[in-house]
Amino acid sequence: MAFFDLPLEELKKYRPERYEEKDFDEFWEETLAESEKFPLDPVFERMESHLKTVEAYDVTFSGYRGQRIKGWLLVPKLEEEKLPCVVQYIGYNGGRGFPHDWLFWPSMGYICFVMDTRGQGSGWLKGDTPDYPEGPVDPQYPGFMTRGILDPRTYYYRRVFTDAVRAVEAAASFPQVDQERIVIAGGSQGGGIALAVSALSKKAKALLCDVPFLCHFRRAVQLVDTHPYAEITNFLKTHRDKEEIVFRTLSYFDGVNFAARAKIPALFSVGLMDNICPPSTVFAAYNYYAGPKEIRIYPYNNHEGGGSFQAVEQVKFLKKLFEKG
């Protein structure tokens, strides 16, 4: 894929008009308050992972409305009494997989909490958490992007984002986690989830947001025909009369609107040839991000973004942040 979006100098200034409903904050306050009525009840069950330098725990905690969510907690076998923690969110249709799939952060001296994404985990890494839709489910295009999309209260990502906030709380409850060094991280869908949590969680202290999905929906579906955004396009291709209803729902889940409310230090990344999460949708979120921020730009990369290069940048970013703090 060659360059297809705005020139870089325009991307750096790109701040489209934000569309959000007046009750955006109220919607999320009520959503989180509903789930806080249920005990978090985190369970950390030590397991035999055959890893020599990492202790692995099979995690279960209460997410949206008390529904039980799976995860992993990976603790490096170090002498420190308290360790920083990275809460990791997963890309589209991936699940938590196995503990040995998530060894990068433990090898860097961080506890890693991996949240399984409800209903997903049959596309690349396996998942173990079912989704529990909100009442009757309207017709949808195959996938997750249009599940419950005719009402923000029934939309799939309402449940996912709530799970993700509760995941930070579950991670924070583990005795060895340093409360002042909790990081939320993810790429693609995981980046979009982490971006939402950066505005919704009071416990997260830093954000690592790579090639984020779930940002500036209307431009994304009008600019690219790749999946997963194409799920929305194909839904509207059939349901020709639902455009405004769909984009109204999506406004409650748009990373651009969460970015405008986020305050914690953040490191973003973008691939300028990314035809899955187009550069302008990433820059829309980045340019509205209200906290201290940096972005790493990879001109000749598609959705893989910076790969291992970005991982090095993240380690340096957190080292500088926490040493300064």
From Swiss-Prot:
GO terms for molecular function: acetylxylan esterase activity; calcium ion binding; carboxylic ester hydrolase activity; cephalosporin-C deacetylase activity. Activity stimulated by up to 40% in the presence of divalent cations such as BaCl(2), CaCl(2), MgCl(2) and MnCl(2) at 3 mM concentration, but inhibited by 82-85% in the presence of CdCl(2) and ZnCl(2) at 3 mM concentration. This is Cephalosporin-C deacetylase. One of its GO terms (biological process) is cephalosporin C metabolic process. GO terms for cellular component: cytoplasm. Belongs to the carbohydrate esterase 7 family. The gene is axeA. InterPro entries: AB_hydrolase_fold (IPR029058), AXE1_dom (IPR008391), CE7 (IPR039069).
